[in-house]
UniProtKB/Swiss-Prot annotation:
<dbReference type="InterPro" id="IPR045851">
    <property type="entry name" value="AMP-bd_C_sf"/>
</dbReference>
<dbReference type="InterPro" id="IPR042099">
    <property type="entry name" value="ANL_N_sf"/>
</dbReference>
<dbReference type="GO" id="GO:0006952">
    <property type="term" value="P:defense response"/>
</dbReference>
<dbReference type="GO" id="GO:0018858">
    <property type="term" value="F:benzoate-CoA ligase activity"/>
</dbReference>
<dbReference type="GO" id="GO:0019761">
    <property type="term" value="P:glucosinolate biosynthetic process"/>
</dbReference>
<feature type="short sequence motif" description="Microbody targeting signal">
    <location>
        <begin position="578"/>
        <end position="580"/>
    </location>
</feature>
<keyword id="KW-0576">Peroxisome</keyword>
<dbReference type="GO" id="GO:0005777">
    <property type="term" value="C:peroxisome"/>
</dbReference>
<dbReference type="InterPro" id="IPR025110">
    <property type="entry name" value="AMP-bd_C"/>
</dbReference>
<comment type="function">
    <text>Benzoate--CoA ligase involved in benzoyloxyglucosinolate biosynthesis in seeds. Glucosinolates are secondary metabolites involved in pathogen and insect defense of cruciferous plants.</text>
</comment>
<dbReference type="Pfam" id="PF00501">
    <property type="entry name" value="AMP-binding"/>
</dbReference>
<protein>
    <recommendedName>
        <fullName>Benzoate--CoA ligase, peroxisomal</fullName>
        <ecNumber>6.2.1.25</ecNumber>
    </recommendedName>
</protein>
<comment type="similarity">
    <text>Belongs to the ATP-dependent AMP-binding enzyme family.</text>
</comment>
<dbReference type="InterPro" id="IPR000873">
    <property type="entry name" value="AMP-dep_synth/lig_dom"/>
</dbReference>
<keyword id="KW-0611">Plant defense</keyword>
<keyword id="KW-0436">Ligase</keyword>
<dbReference type="Pfam" id="PF13193">
    <property type="entry name" value="AMP-binding_C"/>
</dbReference>
Length: 580
């Protein structure tokens, strides 16, 4: 059999672009996108993507060029997940929750040829581009606006418009053929940043092959079925919407796009369009529970919810399921292209008490089909942990959907792929049934509302405050966001000599430090609590013992912000609620 060689007929490079072509042929009358009054069928979406790709090519966008985009979950961002790679380029969806400094760092590192910009983020983009232009006076980044009906069509940067590009695109048959016939399945399809840090941004390079395999594994693992109606509550800039940007096309489904994720909008779209599937971080569960009495009535049909980003509390899962949402827990990383572990439900679990069922649902689960292997190993010895649900180790994974590496960062890439595995940095256990459960994060990453927060980045900002001597940031519980940063601070001696009014002084310092962070960080990264200590706990080598600080933080409570404001100005809480 050694004489049987690979050829063009039996070795076609894998790419999720083929999902779009197939959907347009197999489902010509099915709705592909719903957004307000806008409706597209799959042939229309196919045509729009081909035209946009042709226009990008006419603008000299070519292989491996980076195309950045700042947009909410609108049809344009969905279409660009196909059109940009169809032009041979690499899509860079930017987290629009970051501040201008962080976005400037991403643009500086990615060096895009074009920036697509939704008008709602114009001010943020202006500030980011101003920061870049102050460093490079020759900066000339073309900006293409994505307009909405409620934003008048005017171009503040360049006279370029998204819809105009689609209208003027003229794809020839030979050009279209090349759009769906890539040369190498390992070519990059997307560049996703794990952090907006200015010091060391990590741009995760995802391949066509990885995106294809992860997408298929996700739609099979979730058992999406044919023609799902998918509600976009998860930002598409998060791991390309956990690959469901491509997955809805693979199943001939309908994408219901949303600009704002609020309880009224979610419930309205669910009822109006008979939504069957949605993804979200656990904090969205709290939004769902805030609906009105009509919204909170049981659904006429189940809405399947895939959740991840942080472990959902079992009690929260229980409340949401009673509203007709069928929750499945998943675990993934940007470096893994999307979800890699699914908590697949077992029939025998149906006979267990409800509380125990919810505990099982909160676990991360078993590997997707496209993952070659997952293990929990002792970080020092690299020996596998026993499947006892108790012995902790680092979660390691390997498979064809894993990233190519970090852009322009060989050192970080080498560290990530040590010992032939992707080192996730997450600490967990394996239960006797093979299900993995995360217990901690070895790199001290705080996950707040599905957003990853680097404790080191917050510490670096706090250290710039003149009176801070030492600081360490860990996660503390938050009733809405799951976790939030808590800062432990040692002030300079001159700030701690007067003991009589220490409480008052420390309360004042807490407000000052939090305000300082809000001036220098995205607000979701800022500490909600500052604890002052005489000294930080350390080991014999002088290393700060963060596990001890986490134990303290677990017992702390974040006060409702309205109550805090009311106390400070000595007015009734109702005075402020009426103004929100």
């Amino acid at each position: 059999m050694d004489d049987l060689a690979l050829c063009e007929a039996n070795n076609v490079p894998l790419t999720p672009m083929t999902f779009l072509k197939r959907a347009s042929e197999c489902y010509p009358n099915r709705t592909s996108i719903i957004y307000g009054k806008t409706r597209f069928t799959w042939p229309q979406t196919y045509d729009r993507c081909c035209r946009l790709a042709a226009s990008l090519i006419s603008l000299n966008i070519s292989k491996n060029d980076v195309v950045s985009v700042m947009a909410p979950n609108t049809p344009a961002l969905y279409e660009m997940h196909f059109a940009v790679p169809m032009a041979g380029a690499v899509l860079n969806p930017i987290n629009t929750r970051l501040d201008a400094t962080s976005i400037a760092a991403i643009l500086r590192h990615a060096k895009p040829k074009i920036l697509f910009l939704d008008r709602s983020f114009e001010a943020l983009a202006r500030e980011s581009l101003h920061l870049l232009s102050s460093e490079d006076s020759n900066l000339n980044l073309p900006v293409i606006f994505i307009h909405e009906n409620d934003f008048p069509k005017r171009a503040s940067f360049e006279e370029l418009d998204y819809e105009c590009l689609i209208q003027r695109g003229e794809p020839t048959p030979s050009m279209v053929a090349r759009m769906f016939r890539i040369q190498d399945e390992h070519d990059p399809i997307s560049l996703n940043y794990t952090s907006g840090t200015t010091a060391d941004p990590k741009g995760v390079v995802i391949s066509h092959r990885g995106a294809y395999l992860c997408t298929l594994s996700a739609i099979i693992g979730w058992e999406m079925g044919t023609c799902p109606v998918y509600l976009w509550t998860l930002p598409m800039f998060h791991c390309n919407g956990w690959t469901f940007t491509w997955g809805t096309a693979a199943r001939g489904g309908t994408s219901v796009c949303m600009r704002h994720v609020t309880a009224p909008e979610i419930y309205k779209n669910i009822e109006m369009h008979n939504v069957t599937h949605m993804c979200c971080v656990p904090t969205v569960f709290n939004i769902l529970l805030k609906g009105n009495s009509l919204d909170l009535s049981p659904r006429s049909g189940p809405v399947h919810v895939l959740t991840g980003g942080s472990p959902p509390p079992a009690a929260l899962v229980k409340k949401v399921q009673r509203l007709g949402f069928q929750v499945m827990h998943a675990y993934g990383q940007t470096e893994a292209t999307g979800p890699i572990l699914f908590c697949e439900w077992q029939d025998e679990w149906n006979r267990l008490p409800e509380n125990q069922q919810m505990e099982l649902k909160a676990r991360q689960g078993i590997s997707i089909l496209g993952l070659a292997d997952v293990d929990v190993k002792n970080k020092e010895t690299q020996k596998s942990a026993p499947r006892d649900g108790k012995t902790m180790g680092e979660i390691l994974i390997k498979g064809s959907s894993i990233m190519k590496g970090y852009l322009k960062n060989p050192k970080a890439t080498f560290e990530a792929f040590k010992h032939g595995w992707l080192n996730t940095g997450d600490v967990g256990v394996i239960h006797p049934d093979g299900h993995v459960e995360i217990k901690d994060r070895s790199k001290d990453i705080i996950i707040s509302g599905g957003e990853n927060i680097s404790s080191v980045e917050v510490e670096n900002v706090l250290y710039k405050y003149p009176k801070v001597l030492e600081t360490a940031v860990v996660a503390m519980p938050h009733p809405t966001w799951g976790e939030t940063p808590c800062a432990f601070v040692v002030l300079e001696k001159s700030e701690t000599t007067i003991k009589e009014d220490r409480v008052d002084k420390f309360q004042t310092r807490e407000r000052n430090l939090i305000e300082y962070c809000r001036e220098n960080l995205p607000h979701f990264m800022c500490p909600r609590k500052v604890v002052f200590l005489e000294e930080l706990p350390k080991n014999g080598n002088g290393k700060i013992l963060k596990p001890k600080l986490r134990d303290i933080a677990k017992g702390l409570v974040v006060e409702d912000e309205i109550n805090v404001i009311a106390k400070e100005v000595k007015r009734p809480v109702g005075h402020f609620i009426s103004r929100l």
